[in-house]
Amino acid sequence: MNICVNSLYRLSTPQFHSLYSEDVSDEVLALLIGEVENGNQNCIDLLCNLALRNDDLGHKVEKLLFDLFSGKRSGSPDIDKKINQACLVLHQIANNDITKNNTEWKKLHAPSRLLYMAGSATTDLSKKIGIAHKIMGDQFAQTDQEQVGVENLWCSARMLSSDELAAATQGLVQESPFLSVNYPIGLIHPTTKENILSTQLLEKMAQSGLSENEVFLINTGDHWLICLFYKLAEKIKCLIFNTYYDLNENTKQEIIEAAKIAGISESDEVNFIEMNLQNNVPNGCSLFCYHTIQLLSNAGQNDPVTTLREFAEKFLTLSVEEQALFNTQTRRQIYEYSLQ
């Protein structure tokens, strides 16, 4: 028994048995996690079983597995595939006649990180849609362009909904003293043609004024971009970060007019960074908005223009494979906020 347990899990027999107790020591957990990070499939299976627990340990382990799956935590090159396959096996067990009503399998019958990972591994389309319905409910795309329906949950070209983008960006800056992020808006109201950014800025200025670094997530029709108001040498500046084709002049003018409400006196104080970063990140504008906020929240007092321009230029030097990996991992990291 000792030899078998040690060869499979790199744990002693007492350490292995302790996994079934209410409290698992940090030492045993660290040993198991180390093996998981190295791609040990037996340990991955074991950790996925621990993640089923509906207590602090179960939630901690489930989060750790998702961090490895989403690339937030580094592991062996194929770690995400090993983890989601292990979750898929558990999902199949959870849905057989014996266990389907067992509360111990609750995380595989309701929105959870484990269920999301299982769904990503499912190749059967009808089962994939069934899992997506459990996670999202009956959410459908409003237009052909807004690909937010359940059938597209794991699609590498899926457009994020406003609620998903809001959940991720608000969660991201919850503890950041540097940024204030507003709920995503459209630039122009589709029927009244009102400039919604202008309206939101007027409300902000009337209530509490703008923060030192105030972010607006703006949709120009079928595309998300970042609008940042910040102070530089006691002067209000505005930065637009657009990761697709250059905006048309009408759209730029609408943004410039709105910026005047915040105290921008000259149009040259509105800086447009426009580079197409989306060749290998289809419908990825919202992903870049999320990542931009991540960069800005970690940039401290650095000039945001320099920070974002350097990121964009560096991103364009990445290989196709590296850009595709950014697409996959960022989508997973963003959707995690909708699972909490």
Swiss-Prot record:
It comes from the Bacteria. Coiled coil: none annotated. It is found in: Secreted; Host cytoplasm. The keyword Protease applies. GO terms for molecular function: cysteine-type peptidase activity. GO terms for cellular component: extracellular region; host cell cytoplasm. Its EC number is 3.4.22.-. Transmembrane segments: none annotated. The active site is at H223, C285 (nucleophile). Keywords: Host cytoplasm, Hydrolase, Protease, Secreted, Thiol protease, Virulence. GO terms for biological process: proteolysis. It is an enzyme of class 3 (hydrolase). Belongs to the peptidase C79 family. Effector proteins function to alter host cell physiology and promote bacterial survival in host tissues. This protease targets the host cell ubiquitin pathway by acting as a deubiquitinase in infected host cells. This is Deubiquitinase SseL. The lineage of its organism: Bacteria, Pseudomonadati, Pseudomonadota, Gammaproteobacteria, Enterobacterales.
